[in-house]
């Protein structure tokens, strides 16, 4: 049996976020697992088989020169974006492959420091760039606008490009809102949450409204559960309410499904209506929530609960609420002890033990380009690298992106 290319690579990912704070694409990190040459054509065919027209655009970030050379040589026109590090262009072989790949119609992305942009003859080989702002650029970007009215404020941010390593909310907002950046990779979650520290976190207004509309349309119980699972804070608040003295249920509610069944749709809608006036409309929180949802989906896929739906839902919930401490600002153990959850969830999220810890730790590791950490987790938990990569690609291919309306 021919080994799949997914067994010879270590993959990781990072979301690309648009100016509307919606998912715009995925940066896919690809590391050679060994010194063996990776069949880049096989990798691209594997991705093509899993991807659909609605899947997010991909930016493939090869983490070795050899893998990049193979991608540049073998990728056909219409392949995902391929990243080329600026410093690697000093390698004459890579530069030659870049020029021929550009002539074949490949879409290439230059990655590097905004202060070291390529010369025009090199730059024309690239469709876009993934830029890092220098500290002095960040300071300049955040200077107040000119005092004289009518004087245009110039930005150091180049419009239409992508940016990475943006650690502050103010700089992210400058890039996306003022600098007209195409996207930012990753998200300044810590600073966004810090900027909101004086305001208790609330569930998403959009998710609450979506769930109310689904109830009005008499959609399925599975649909209600899926929508509620789009917001970790809404799911948590719902379960806290279900287990409160206000409802007086005789048995503890340990899952969203059970809570939906026990509470009844009219009562759920009344409860949602009570949440709506205080709900969050801050667009900067959308990437925070969606990142938690992707982590939950990955955790469930990695543990491959199969046909046991209750178990799959429990694993999803484990991944969804695993970072609630970041939203609520108190220890995760304290938060989870308010609910009669499965001990398996508490063990994985707080104690880092038990049957769910492998999937949860791997889902978190895959959010980075740390190949050593991913390899170590595969060894520790005896996880098959090919299956890990396949689970990752399946989850990523199912994500939805906001696309511009088709031209008439």
Model segments located where?
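Short, low-complexity, intrinsically disordered N-terminal peptides in bacterial proteins
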Residues: 1-8, 136, 151-152, 407-408
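Bacterial c-di-GMP phosphodiesterase EAL domain
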Residues: 1-81, 86-93, 287
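Generic structural hydrophobic/aromatic packing signal, biased to beta-strands
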Residues: 11, 28, 60, 82, ...
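Amphipathic alpha-helical regulatory segments at dimerization interfaces
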Residues: 46-50, 100, 301-305
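Conserved alpha-helical "signature site"
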Residues: 55, 142-408
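Surface-exposed, flexible loop/turn segments at secondary-structure boundaries
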Residues: 66, 116, 137, 192, ...
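The catalytic core of metal-dependent phosphodiesterases that act on cyclic dinucleotides
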Residues: 74-189, 314
């Amino acid at each position: 049996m021919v080994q799949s290319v997914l067994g010879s690579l270590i993959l990781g990912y990072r979301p690309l976020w648009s100016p509307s704070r919606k998912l715009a694409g995925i940066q896919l990190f690809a590391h050679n697992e060994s010194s063996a040459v990776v069949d880049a054509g096989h990798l691209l065919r594997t991705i093509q088989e899993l991807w659909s027209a609605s899947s997010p655009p991909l930016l493939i970030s090869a983490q070795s020169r050899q893998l990049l050379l193979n991608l540049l040589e073998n990728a056909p026109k219409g392949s995902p974006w391929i990243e080329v590090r600026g410093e690697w262009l000093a390698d004459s072989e890579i530069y030659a492959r870049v020029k021929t790949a550009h002539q074949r119609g490949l879409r290439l992305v230059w990655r590097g420091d905004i202060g070291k942009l390529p010369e025009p003859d090199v730059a024309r080989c690239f469709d876009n760039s993934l830029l890092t702002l220098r500290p002095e650029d960040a300071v300049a970007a955040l200077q107040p606008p000119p005092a004289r009215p009518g004087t245009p404020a110039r930005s150091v941010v180049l419009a239409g490009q992508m940016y990475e390593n943006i650690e502050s909310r103010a700089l992210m907002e400058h890039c996306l809102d003022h600098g007209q950046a195409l996207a930012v990779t990753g998200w300044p979650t810590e600073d966004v949450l810090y900027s909101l520290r004086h305001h208790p976190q609330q569930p998403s207004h959009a998710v609450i409204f979506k769930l109310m509309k689904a109830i009005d349309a008499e959609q399925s119980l599975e649909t209600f559960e899926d929508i509620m699972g789009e917001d970790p804070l809404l799911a948590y608040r719902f379960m806290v309410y279900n287990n409160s003295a206000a409802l007086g249920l005789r048995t503890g509610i340990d899952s969203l499904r059970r809570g939906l069944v026990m509470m009844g749709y009219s009562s759920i809608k009344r409860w949602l209506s009570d949440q709506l006036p205080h709900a969050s409309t801050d667009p900067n929180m959308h990437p925070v929530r969606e990142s938690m949802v992707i982590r939950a989906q990955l955790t469930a896929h990695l543990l491959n609960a199969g046909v046991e739906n209750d178990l799959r839902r429990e694993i999803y919930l484990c991944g969804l609420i695993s970072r609630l401490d970041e939203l609520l600002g108190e220890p995760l153990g304290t938060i989870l002890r308010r609910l009669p959850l499965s001990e398996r969830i508490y063990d994985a999220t707080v104690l880092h033990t038990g049957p769910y810890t492998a999937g949860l730790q791997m889902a978190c590791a895959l959010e980075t380009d740390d190949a050593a950490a991913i390899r170590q987790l595969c060894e520790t938990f005896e996880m098959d690298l090919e299956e890990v990569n396949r689970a990752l690609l399946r989850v990523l291919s199912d994500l939805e992106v906001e696309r511009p309306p088709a031209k008439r």
